[in-house]
Structure formats: C-alpha cells, structure tokens
C-alpha cells in the first residue's frame, strides 16, 4: 500500500565512510545540517515531489563530525526494513549515495540516481539501464576507490580517507563539486 498519497522520492543520505557522502564545499563541519540535501529538497518540493528520508539514524559519522538528515524532508527514521521497502517501491524514484539503501532500491527495480564520484562510472550499476542515473563530475579528482590497493592503500579505520587530497583544500572534491542543481538536472526526466 502506498504510504504517501502525494508524489514523493526517497533520499538515502547516509553511508559508511565520509568519502561516500555528498560533502559540502564549506567542509564537513556543516554536514550535520545536510546543506546540499536541503537545497535539493526545496527543488523537489517546487517540482511537486515530497522528499522522504528512511534512514535508521538522524546523525551518522565519526567524532567530531556527523552527517545529518535534511530538515526539509519528511523523516521516517528507524522504520522497519519492510516499511523502508514499501516507501522505496511506491516512490517516483530514489536518490542516494553508494550505500545499502541505494542497492536495495536498485534491487527493487526502482529508478535510482546515485551520487557517487569516488568510484568509476562502471563500478556500481549498469550504465545502460534507463532506470539508473550516475551523478558524477569528471572535471575533478574521482575514481580513487577503484585504484585503492593498486596505487595506494585503503585505510579502513580512517573515516576521512581521501588518498590523494586529504587535509588539503581539495579534500573530498569528488563530491563537493557536485551541486544540488546538477543533481536536480540529472533527475528532471523522472519528474
């Protein structure tokens, strides 16, 4: 049964490493406010789409920085897996990071827009699948995940792992370079 009568999209805003997050140009200190996601939520609402977040946690990350849920979304936090599946199945589409919820949405046959610039285009899903949009910026550093173990070691205990630009102004530029407008333009065909 459809959980919301209006048209809506499910957003997957959390992941398992800061490298996978949609980081903001102002740095990780602002991430608990989910600035990029809030701007995208405004754009979706103006287009008649209600943004819904079905994450387990309101905040997720590593001290002293945590990533938050967009305040401008409908929050369905900590719901059961079956309820999460129901929300995703009946949504217009899913927008997320490289994360379990994105894989779940893809497995359910839902249209998926994945914000993922740390891995190469071919890595997660079939680029020929019309239900899949890969949101990337090839004009900046990207794809380090697919070179880990070859060109440099992956350090799993380092939440802020960025093998090329860590602790420089370019730290996480793979995702800070992706704007809410770029994401919105990438999914316009589904609205």
What are the language-model segments listed below?
Residues 26-123:
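Donor-binding and catalytic core of enzymes assembling or modifying cell-surface/extracellular glycoconjugates
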């Amino acid at each position: 049964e459809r959980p919301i009568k209006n048209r809506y999209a499910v957003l997957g805003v959390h992941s398992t490493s800061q490298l996978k997050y949609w980081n903001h140009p102002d740095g990780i200190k602002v991430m608990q406010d989910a600035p990029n996601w809030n701007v995208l939520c405004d754009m979706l609402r103006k287009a008649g789409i209600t943004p819904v977040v079905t994450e387990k946690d309101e905040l997720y990350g590593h001290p002293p920085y945590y990533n938050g849920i967009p305040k401008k979304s409908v929050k369905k936090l900590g719901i059961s897996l079956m309820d999460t599946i129901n929300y995703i199945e009946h949504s217009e589409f899913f927008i997320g990071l490289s994360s379990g919820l994105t894989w779940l949405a893809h497995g359910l046959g839902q249209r998926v827009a994945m914000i993922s610039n740390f891995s190469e285009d071919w890595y997660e899903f079939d680029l020929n699948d019309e239900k899949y949009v890969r949101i990337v910026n090839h004009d900046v550093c990207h794809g380090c995940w697919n070179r880990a173990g070859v060109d440099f070691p992956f350090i799993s205990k380092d939440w802020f792992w960025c093998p090329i630009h860590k602790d420089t102004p370019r730290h996480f530029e793979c995702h800070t370079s992706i704007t809410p407008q770029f994401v919105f333009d990438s999914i316009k065909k589904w609205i």
